[in-house]
């Protein structure tokens, strides 16, 4: 088990950190939208961002979710919040270090490439499956997003249609 460039795998960790930090994210998004953080407008926007990031692997949604981790709406500050969460959860080889491209966001980061490991990925997915990631309800929502993943050619590509895959 060793750290490697994460590519889009980092989005699952950002999803987990975002569920953990959802109250602050709601406040940050409410400020941007000039809406109450508990409003349906904020709820709908955050759901679309999360769905686009996880289900459709949208890079700009990832960049925006990282920025929303703090009221400053700055990528590097948000990355530090996520990385603190990752350390607290025991993900030793995973870190958000850079924006993802292609996207509308100018390249920015704390380092060269986002990192993760096979062990960290397996641990996160197991926690989600066992309903132990943030809360049972949040785990269910995360699993639903993963089950609806739009890209079906890689991980589930060689499996029978009847096999349920969350990726």
Q: What name fits each language-model region?
A:
Residues 4-33, 53:
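Active-site SXXK
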Residues 19-47, 135-140:
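Short, well-structured active-site flanking segments
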Residues 38, 56-58:
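Structured, acidic catalytic/metal-binding patches in enzyme active sites
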Residues 50, 60-133:
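Mid-domain, small-residue-enriched loop/turn segments at the edges of structured enzyme/sensor domains
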Residues 144-151:
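Small-residue-rich helix-loop
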Residues 153-167:
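Short, Gly/Ser/Thr-enriched beta-strand-loop segments that form substrate-interacting elements
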């Amino acid at each position: 088990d060793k750290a490697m460039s994460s590519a889009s795998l980092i989005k699952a960790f950002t999803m987990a950190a975002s569920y953990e930090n959802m109250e602050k994210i709601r406040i940050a998004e409410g400020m941007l939208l000039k809406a109450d953080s508990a409003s349906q407008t904020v709820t709908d926007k955050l759901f679309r961002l999360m769905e686009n990031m996880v289900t459709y692997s949208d890079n700009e949604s990832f960049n925006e979710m990282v920025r929303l981790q703090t009221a400053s709406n700055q990528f590097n500050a948000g990355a530090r919040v996520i990385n603190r969460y990752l350390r607290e959860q025991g993900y030793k080889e995973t870190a958000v270090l850079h924006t993802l491209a292609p996207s509308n966001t100018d390249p920015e980061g704390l380092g060269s490439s986002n990192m993760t490991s096979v062990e960290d990925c397996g641990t996160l997915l197991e926690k989600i499956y066992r309903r132990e990631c943030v809360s049972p309800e949040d785990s269910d929502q995360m699993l639903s997003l993963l089950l609806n993943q739009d890209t079906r050619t890689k991980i589930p590509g060689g499996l029978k249609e009847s096999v349920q895959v969350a990726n």
